[in-house]
Amino acid sequence: MNFAAMMVVAIGIDLALGWPDALYKRIGHPVTWIARLIARLEKGWNFKGRLRRLRGVLVALAVIGTTVVIALAVQLWLPAGWPGVLIGGILAWPFVALRSMHDHVAAVAKPLIAGDLPGARQAVSMIVGRDPSQLDQPGVARAALESLAENSSDGIVAPLFWGCVAGLPGIAGYKAINTLDSMIGHRTDRYEEFGWASARIDDLVNLIPARLTGLFFALASPCRARALAVMARDARSHRSPNAGWPEAAMAGALAVRLSGPRIYADRVANEPWLNGTAPDPRPADLARGLALYRRAMAGMTLVIGLVAVLWSVS
């Protein structure tokens, strides 16, 4: 089956509809179903003891395995040819978030550009974990741009990459891994051991997509050479083995600095800067970042479309 064509169908539906509120109220969302399973298993299995890491490994394997097996069973029942591609694309649609990502960051950009800092702080609190009350205009712009860059990889390029590789099991399995990491893959007393496997697996499956995302941002920039140079120089200085690639490419493309120190509700993170000699982002840079995002995602879609065409004629 042409998995790349299936992903193109999913992209098209997502761009046209997003995930409608009426549908969410009626059936929820597949990621929330996965999250409920994780929460239930974590509640029963995450307790102190010398086997805490092993229990976390088993929970991660159970969640990923359950998701992949269900998705594989559904995929095996799809009809052959283009009807199967169309149905598969509809089923993959909930795992794609191009429109949602753009809308969430645009909701920050609108009040920030208008000078409404409280409104921008409220909007950015929906997409980042840091304390918004401490953020000035450059801080809000920086937080939103970092979220846009990192989540373009985690929420868009990575699931589509694995969808192209393995179809429904690939895209659904990736989302299970990413949801595990977002819920239990934290370096806290509660999750350091229990979430160890989830965090490591997430790092592994994002190795290629994160670098591809950085490349898409760099190639979509009018200043390709600078974006590529900043990415190559600074990406590895990020605390994450993967997030630095799209963030550094974004920083180079927009000629701003990203990452750096930030305040969370429970801690202060003193991170190195990406493109540290550049100025802080301004509100207008957030609009430029959204334009870069649109070009990069258009380029990604074109690449997937070309893969689909080559697949169909091979």
UniProtKB/Swiss-Prot annotation:
- GO BP annotations, alphabetical order: cobalamin biosynthetic process
Q: In which pathway does it act?
A: Cofactor biosynthesis; adenosylcobalamin biosynthesis
Function in brief: Converts cobyric acid to cobinamide by the addition of aminopropanol on the F carboxylic group.
Q: How does it sit in the membrane?
A: Multi-pass membrane protein
Q: Where in the cell is it found?
A: Cell membrane
Task: Report any Pfam family annotated for this entry.
Answer: CobD_Cbib
> Which keywords does the record carry?
Cell membrane, Cobalamin biosynthesis, Membrane, Transmembrane, Transmembrane helix
Q: Which PANTHER family match?
A: COBALAMIN BIOSYNTHESIS PROTEIN CBIB
Q: Which organism is it from?
A: Rhodobacter capsulatus
Transmembrane helix as a keyword of this entry, yes or no, is yes
As for family, the record states: Belongs to the CobD/CbiB family.
The name under which this protein is listed is Cobalamin biosynthesis protein CobD
